[in-house]
Amino acid sequence: MGTAGKVIKCKAAVLWGVNQPFSIEEIEVAPPKAKEVRVKILATGICRTDDHIIKGSMVSKFPVIVGHEAVGVVESVGEGVTTVRPGDKVIPLFLPQCRECNACLNPEGNLCIRSDLTGRGVLADGTTRFTCKGKPVQHFMNTSTFTEYTVLDESSVAKVDGAAPPEKACLIGCGFSTGYGAAVKTAKVTPGSTCVVFGLGGVGLSVIMGCKAAGASRIIGIDINKDKFQKALAVGATECISPKDSTKPISEVLSDMTGNTIQYTFEVIGRLETMVDALSSCHMNYGTSVVVGAPPSAKMLTYDPMLLFTGRTWKGCVFGGWKSRDDVPKLVTEFLEKKFDLDQLITHTLPFNNINEGFELLYSGKSIRTVLTF
């Protein structure tokens, strides 16, 4: 492209501080350095994790460009890039895969050493590629997709099938893959099992889809918002309940419902109390509980160790357990083969300039996933 090697001026949604709205600004995006890729974003989803930066529950320096769930096309590449080239359709990866560190080399690992889940805010060389009004702007989780152009490390980019529709396939960059993988890859749900999903947002619905695909015979969805039940049932839940409908602890309610046969539970909210509830609700000896929801920073869990002593398994789950560069292209292929339906998760599509409206839909509970298009 004619812009290769040049600074690009473009539009981005910049966050200048905690609890502030996004400001649509003109920014400058520097060319990619060695082993980096500059990507033109085509569509990006709004995820609850982005809101953690707005609310201050995740650490970040400001100003920052957040967003991490997207599809784009490679505009240019830096020296030494071999896995993608200009014109390739790609999904940015908030969880990179360097294919060299211990986690990448272990068949069960996926938390690459190059991950930025702690708010470092810069690329591998310690600098940013974004400038706005003469000030450096921070990156977010190696991705920063709320902008027309972004720069990523080569390890944070997956080449995908060019037929993938950006406004749908972007969900594979985070929300869908995280939930679906929690069931089929992390928990390894077995046919005929009983599963319980705490939290029926977009990721929770994706967990349900994964449980159904794995052959679970009973899938119970839990949420305090009953407006979410219809969609949960549509994607595969067999029944839904609200904790507000009983004075009993939810673990007792579930035990009464199932005869104490729950093999898998999933916490997809990020609340400490619900994490313990989910652990308490799976079978005391052979149950597995998976923490999927991003926990708040600097908080500690308190729980009875007997919950684990009797044999339960408590697992964490980042990006569904997938090895990002290896598995994301496969998931896109499965989507194109109609093995799962992402349309059920997308409730709103808005132009990028309406990003603040998209977050209001998130706060009001009216949206499952809102996708912004450029």
From Swiss-Prot:
- EC annotation? 1.1.1.105, 1.1.1.1, 1.1.1.66
Q: Where in the cell is it found?
A: Cytoplasm
Residues at which Zn(2+) 1 binds: 47, 68, 174
| Keywords noted in UniProt | Cytoplasm, Lipid metabolism, Metal-binding, NAD, Oxidoreductase, Zinc
Q: Which residues bind Zn(2+) 2?
A: 98, 101, 104, 112
| The protein, known as | All-trans-retinol dehydrogenase [NAD(+)] ADH7
InterPro entries, alphabetized: ADH-like_C, ADH-like_N, ADH_Zn_CS, GroES-like_sf, NAD(P)-bd_dom_sf, PKS_ER
List the cofactors. Answer: Zn(2+)
**One MF term from GO for this chain?**
omega-hydroxydecanoate dehydrogenase activity
- What is reported on the regulation of this protein's activity? Retinol oxidation is inhibited by the detergent Tween 80. Ethanol inhibits both all-trans-retinol and 9-cis-retinol oxidation. 13-cis-retinol is an effective competitive inhibitor of the 9-cis-retinol oxidation. All-trans-retinoic acid is a powerful inhibitor of all-trans-retinol oxidation. 13-cis-retinoic acid is a powerful inhibitor of all-trans-retinol oxidation. Cimetidine competitively inhibited ethanol oxidation.
Residues the record lists as binding NAD(+)? 199-204, 223, 228, 292-294, 369
Quote the function comment for this protein. Answer: Catalyzes the NAD-dependent oxidation of all-trans-retinol, alcohol, aldehyde and omega-hydroxy fatty acids and their derivatives. Oxidizes preferentially all trans-retinol, all-trans-4-hydroxyretinol, 9-cis-retinol, 2-hexenol, and long chain omega-hydroxy fatty acids such as juniperic acid. In vitro can also catalyze the NADH-dependent reduction of all-trans-retinal and aldehydes and their derivatives. Reduces preferentially all trans-retinal, all-trans-4-oxoretinal and hexanal. Catalyzes in the oxidative direction with higher efficiency.
Give the principal location in a single coarse category: cytoplasm
Q: Subunit info? A: Homodimer.
What GO cellular component term, any one, is given? cytosol
Q: Which organism is it from?
A: Mus musculus
Could you provide one GO biological process annotation from this protein's UniProt record?
retinoic acid metabolic process
A Pfam family cross-referenced in the UniProt record is ADH_zinc_N
Q: In which tissues is it expressed?
A: High expression in the stomach mucosa. Lower expression in eye, thymus, skin and ovary. Very low expression in small intestine, liver and uterus.
Q: Which reaction(s) does its UniProt entry say it catalyses? A: a primary alcohol + NAD(+) = an aldehyde + NADH + H(+); 10-hydroxydecanoate + NAD(+) = 10-oxodecanoate + NADH + H(+); all-trans-retinol + NAD(+) = all-trans-retinal + NADH + H(+); 9-cis-retinol + NAD(+) = 9-cis-retinal + NADH + H(+)
Family statement: Belongs to the zinc-containing alcohol dehydrogenase family. Class-IV subfamily.
- Free-text remark on how the cofactor is bound: Binds 2 Zn(2+) ions per subunit.
